[in-house]
Amino acid sequence: TXFITDPVEXVSE
């Protein structure tokens, strides 16, 4: 995601 929004989403994206 580019920044930490939800750890479930894949924090490194």
Curated annotation (Swiss-Prot):
It comes from the Eukaryota. On the 2D-gel the determined pI of this unknown protein is: 6.9, its MW is: 55.4 kDa. This is Unknown protein from spot 7520 of 2D-PAGE of heart tissue. It comes from Canis lupus familiaris (Dog). The lineage of its organism: Eukaryota, Metazoa, Chordata, Craniata, Vertebrata.
